[in-house]
């Protein structure tokens, strides 16, 4: 196993141009493929999850030209649903990319063809039952190949009817995102009713915005009910700029708050569509100095104190708060993050385990975590659980006058392949 030993970082200072958002990149690629016309995507994220989507689209008959640096992609839209009936059974390997598995599962039900959706072992532990149930309500033919409610899946594309659909919103917002993006191409109008509390609402806002950018508007009734007209076609916007990844910004902003100097991240700002920019508000509540621009956020050092906050709206960036808590006085309480348990790994268990290794006192609950900083951080080998965010979060331990060893550092390739080089570039 590869390891990366990070030496203590005394101070951070400088500017980071963020890679494109994973959530936006894969949504934009799929809608560009289904749209009428050609879309040029710029600032596309170059990472494993995006590669899995691109590979799948190629197999599905979508033509695109990817630039040498893989950050620009010209997609020739089909102007219709996928139709691979003449190709026989197609197997699509999607790694551990939830942002590819869930939306493709819904989109493939719209057209003609037979598909197997598969991936890495962890993907088979990530639930998809709520989405499949909703698709079956709309007439889709989706079956489980191994365990009920989990991939791998077999899909027989026969079109989606639409109609009145109930979908569980309490586990992952990606189920609703997937259904929303497919619904305009259903045969009839669709009315979606959310059952339970809808988690990660900001990610649904991203979905509604990008659908709008591709010419489709959704009638949103307070995130409890959504009405979508059927028999529509997405329209290529011509050019689509992918915002910087707000979740990826969190590590650098936290570093600025802990050991600035001043860190400026560009590619996101107060006009961003991503909910994870609210991470900066949480940092500010802890005592960091934050400055907002239209397309940048700056963070500088402050005396950090613990916070007690419901972070259901920023689940990915909330992980960074858990590590920032190592530098705060008092006990930080992060609440309402059950969906950490169904991400790339069980993040509540993983976070609690690794925080204890560096000396923190941790309480792990069903849907919350409490973190109290030690008097002194200790050098530990951090297991990353094949989870990109674990590796990036725990790099911040090096800001505490201690070495930290990151196991399997290349797992950051899921969203941020050159993360450690970028961190080194602002380390003094």
Swiss-Prot record:
A GO biological process held by the record: amino acid biosynthetic process
PROSITE patterns: EPSP_SYNTHASE_1, EPSP_SYNTHASE_2
EC supergroup of this enzyme: transferase
The UniProt record lists the keyword Amino-acid biosynthesis: yes
Subcellular location: Cytoplasm
Active-site residues, Swiss-Prot/TrEMBL: 316 (proton acceptor)
Known partners and oligomeric status: Monomer.
Functional summary from the UniProt entry: Catalyzes the transfer of the enolpyruvyl moiety of phosphoenolpyruvate (PEP) to the 5-hydroxyl of shikimate-3-phosphate (S3P) to produce enolpyruvyl shikimate-3-phosphate and inorganic phosphate.
Protein name: 3-phosphoshikimate 1-carboxyvinyltransferase
Classification lineage: Bacteria, Pseudomonadati, Pseudomonadota, Gammaproteobacteria, Alteromonadales
